[in-house]
Amino acid sequence: MKALDQLTFDNRFARLGDAFSTQVLPEPIADPRLVIASKSAMALLDLDPAQADTPVFAELFSGHKLWEGADPRAMVYSGHQFGSYNPRLGDGRGLLLAEVVNDAGEHWDLHLKGAGQTPYSRMGDGRAVLRSSIREFLASEALHALGIATSRALCVIGSSTPVWRETRESAAMLTRLAQSHVRFGHFEYFYYTKQPEQQRVLIDHVLEQHYPECREAEQPYLAMFRTIVERNAELIAHWQAYGFCHGVMNTDNMSILGITFDFGPYAFLDDFDANFICNHSDDRGRYSYANQVPIAHWNLSALAQALTTVIEVEPLKEALGLFLPLYQAHYLDLMRRRLGLTTAEDDDMALVERLLQRMQSGGVDYNLFFRRLGDQPVAEALKGVRDDFIDLAGFDAWGADYLARCEREAGNGDGRRERMHAVNPLYVLRNYLAQKAIEAAEAGDYSEVRRLHQVLSTPFEEQAGMQAYAERPPAWGKHLEISCSS
């Protein structure tokens, strides 16, 4: 394992030139102190976890010091926000500090969020608050532990620097890791500003660095777009299967890698509600849980439009047409696993849909239901969850069909509990848990955010003394809507 001064850098995106980013030095925050660090994220850089406890760690990730090989850059991009095109966005408070090459030859972006003003700050102060930084850290690491593709969070550094949002808060910096920070909005920027040469440079960069398997295809650009469609179909299937709501699916928040990116007012479902809106600013429900599938397709079509400079329209349409069937296949596979099914039958989607209808009408806790369904043999498990439902006759009818479905599988009961517990988390990141950790951290106590992170790092395994993190939320904690303010 390495010390901080032993990292190797290869800043490929910075070398693309000033048309793609602007060199900006981070503005340090006062009195930097470590709030939390992820040992598993540090391992991606081959960093010794003990480095997090050194003074230089907080200094490097708060803007006070800079590596000799770093080349901090604010990236330029545009994007569709709530369906309307915004011609010039860019990193308004984040900097791509450097690209680290680990011993396996993997490149990881070090991105500092809350690093101060940039040419793209759009009248903002360039800061991130402790509250939103903790939320992104927890979500990144929780989704990773669930097996959902996501950017990673290395650390959060707190400070005494004041910032004003709805009230006075303290500034913080989050260091995010991803193998690329290129967004759909990067391609839109060069398309709508009519810069075809720069557009092609960017496309070639992404193809070469992130989709090398597509280079030998008959149409490499089309093969790359098709793979992006495939990755997003799988990603959104995981979101829907595990009840994750992103909240701000603007095209500038969509990663070209098909990973969860730019966490804001996100939430996991508590009681199942297909129409749940987690973003307080989304008064029309554009980014509701139910709309995430069509919005992902819409965003991919926006990316496709930006790629019409290098790919014919009809092949792009054909590739876009793959999204929904691929999504449905991935989603159904995940839901079969969550139900403990090991084979496929034609009526399985109808079985899932009928269950969700019963859950919606009864206000049943989404993730907890699946966990409890795997606690016992099928017949006993159905009795155990029955009282959660209001329409008992409707649930009994569904339960009879589910029991019959399980009985048609040879050996379904063998290892059922272990099989279902391996895919149905006991612990999920509920907003009220995050809020309690944030309030403690704002008072200077970081123990709760660290404890919550530890619990969420192994969400499928029961942990001694952590029952409180596996319970239904209190009435005040259900379906919290979160502001975009960060």
UniProtKB/Swiss-Prot annotation:
The active site is at D252 (proton acceptor). Mg(2+) binds at N253, D262. Its cofactor is Mg(2+); Mn(2+). Disulfide bonds: none annotated. The keyword Ion transport does not apply. ATP binds at G90, G92, R93, K113, D125, G126, R176, R183, D262. GO terms for molecular function: AMPylase activity; ATP binding; magnesium ion binding. Pfam families: SelO. Its EC number is 2.7.7.-, 2.7.7.108. It is an enzyme of class 2 (transferase). Keywords: ATP-binding, Magnesium, Manganese, Metal-binding, Nucleotide-binding, Nucleotidyltransferase, Transferase. Nucleotidyltransferase involved in the post-translational modification of proteins. It can catalyze the addition of adenosine monophosphate (AMP) or uridine monophosphate (UMP) to a protein, resulting in modifications known as AMPylation and UMPylation. Belongs to the SELO family. This is Protein nucleotidyltransferase YdiU. It comes from Pseudomonas putida (strain W619). The gene is ydiU.
